Swiss-Prot record:
Cofactor (UniProt): Mg(2+); Mn(2+)
Positions that bind Mg(2+): 245, 254
Reactions performed catalytically: L-seryl-[protein] + ATP = 3-O-(5'-adenylyl)-L-seryl-[protein] + diphosphate; L-threonyl-[protein] + ATP = 3-O-(5'-adenylyl)-L-threonyl-[protein] + diphosphate; L-tyrosyl-[protein] + ATP = O-(5'-adenylyl)-L-tyrosyl-[protein] + diphosphate; L-histidyl-[protein] + UTP = N(tele)-(5'-uridylyl)-L-histidyl-[protein] + diphosphate
Keywords tagged on the record: ATP-binding, Magnesium, Manganese, Metal-binding, Nucleotide-binding, Nucleotidyltransferase, Transferase
Pfam families per the UniProt record, alphabetical: SelO
Lineage: Bacteria, Pseudomonadati, Pseudomonadota, Gammaproteobacteria, Alteromonadales
Record-level Gene Ontology MF annotations: AMPylase activity; ATP binding; magnesium ion binding
Protein name stated in the entry: Protein nucleotidyltransferase YdiU
């Protein structure tokens, strides 16, 4: 790997230098060929294994943990920071630079009495979801590899330590700006320094002045709205949408007790530590705006409040428009050129009525959408009908759908288009759990198979049909904990 060290050299007050502590008996558990290409790597090697496991120095790396704060479950925590993630620097690749971080690399000054380690199950889950979201077309950080060990760590019970090698276009979070506004009062110069660095690194077309700052914040609002529209369309619940888990680039970031929907539930809670459902699936759009408001609050020393509010007011429109684009594609509805607000509302109601039907009939979210690839939209009889219990209610919806759909002249092409946007394979929690159990038993084959299938989520892959099925009873609606 070839590194540059812009964050390390230009923002010395934004991190603490800390070196990883190696794990014992390191070994590869998973490797992403796709992610490796981003930083010009080929195959995993012994030299790379030693370096990324913290057992040897990586040439050109500057090891550091970033400091930030954040709102966690609605309350402000004044000092967080990378408690178990150590960044090596920005690795250069054919299409730009990517931060390389060792998640689980050992304790840092921000560990808050933690051991700085990640357990194997959480490392595997982060690897799989990073791959899954990327291949579904959802903006996300990437995972290069998972490195296992025989090092014991204790959570609810004894587990083994592992490291996820994460790649990110940036590790700058909403919480970085909050820290230098709230926790380090009177440090407007640091906010400006961080803003200028962010613009030069990631928005070089914007000027480092008030006009550039305003344009940047509007872009963050729009990118966040688009990200959450993706989550709602694909059926993904993040689970811990704290402001310190929000990327300023609009990438999915910092995965914990996430879940893809099995049976559709509008307010599905995937996090055992969220009994009130603050971060439930259906709450994500509102939380996205709430988090942006906290970011805006942190930026008031450098951007006038009226300009911040004007940008925040664009959030709902950006969210709805991107969500409509994604959902119209799933349903096969033509995009309306210069659609009116009334037409958009009609489409939202049509989509909403269908998801309500899904929930009432306890249908699998992804599998139901996939069935549109078998639908003959020109037929008055829908092959979907047999999936529903309330047939009259479905018939009323389907008639309205056909009216909105209009005439389809090439049914086969229409069906293929549906299969290109409605995935057959998603990362169901029970599949991840089965792969983790197999890894614990020394069998990597299920993990490797699941990983390869998730790289082509829209392909039929008939030899892997079992991975597209609804979960067994024990795997329905699995709720994970924040313990990792």
């Amino acid at each position: 790997m070839k590194f540059k060290q812009d964050f390390f050299t230009q923002l010395p007050e934004f991190y603490a230098q800390v070196y990883p502590q190696g794990i014992s008996n390191p070994h590869w558990l998973a490797w992403s060929e796709d992610a490796a290409k981003l930083i010009d790597l080929q195959q995993p090697t012994d030299v790379l294994l030693k370096g990324l496991s913290g057992n040897a120095a990586v040439e050109g790396a500057s090891y550091y943990a970033q400091v930030y704060s954040g709102h966690q479950f609605g309350g402000y925590t004044p000092r967080l920071g990378d408690g178990r993630s150590i960044i090596l620097g920005e690795a250069l690749g054919p299409q730009g630079a990517w931060d390389v971080a060792l998640k689980g690399g050992g304790p840092t000054p921000y560990s808050r009495h933690g051991d700085g380690r990640a357990v194997m199950r959480s490392a595997v889950r982060e690897f799989l979801v990073s791959e899954a979201l990327h291949h579904l077309g959802v903006p996300t950080t990437r995972a290069l590899a998972v490195i296992g060990s025989d090092m014991p760590v204790w959570r609810e019970s004894q587990e083994t330590a592992a490291i996820t090698v994460r790649l990110a276009r940036s590790h700058i979070r909403f919480g970085h700006f909050e820290f230098f506004c709230h926790s380090e009062r009177g440090q407007a110069d640091k906010l400006t320094q961080l803003l200028n660095f962010t613009l030069k690194q990631h928005y070089p077309h914007l000027s480092c002045d008030l006009a550039g700052y305003k344009a940047w914040f509007l872009q963050v609002v729009q990118d966040t709205a688009k990200l959450i529209a993706h989550w709602q369309a694909i059926g993904f619940a993040h689970g811990v949408m704290n402001t310190d888990n929000m990327s300023i680039l609009g990438d999915s970031f910092d995965f914990g007790p996430f879940a893809f929907l099995d049976t559709f539930q509008e307010y599905f809670i995937c996090n055992h530590s969220d009994p009130e459902g603050r971060y439930a699936f259906g709450q994500q759009p509102g939380i996205g705006l709430w988090n942006l408001q906290r970011l805006a609050q942190a930026l008031t020393p450098v951007i006038p409040s009226d300009d911040l509010i004007a940008a925040l007011n664009q959030y709902q429109h950006a969210l709805v428009q991107h969500y409509l684009m994604l959902m119209r594609a799933k349903l096969g509805l033509a995009e309306r050129a210069d659609s009116t607000a009334e037409q958009d509302q009609q489409d939202l109601e049509l989509i909403g009525r269908f998801t309500v039907l899904m929930e009432k009939n306890q249908l699998d979210y992804s599998n139901t959408w996939r069935r549109f690839g078998q639908l003959d939209p020109s037929s008055a009889h829908s092959s979907l009908r047999d999936d529903f219990i309330d047939l009259n209610e479905f018939d009323v919806w389907y008639q309205a759908y056909q009216v909105r759909l209009g005439k389809v002249t090439d049914v086969e092409a229409w069906q293929q288009a549906r299969n290109s946007v409605n995935p057959k394979y998603i990362l169901r929690n029970y599949l991840a759990q089965e792969a983790i159990i197999a890894v614990e038993e020394g069998n990597l084959a299920p993990l490797e198979r699941l990983h390869q299938v998730l790289r082509q989520p829209f392909a039929e892959q008939v030899e892997h049909e079992d991975l597209a099925k609804r979960p067994p009873d024990w795997g329905q609606g699995l709720i994970m904990s924040c313990s990792s």
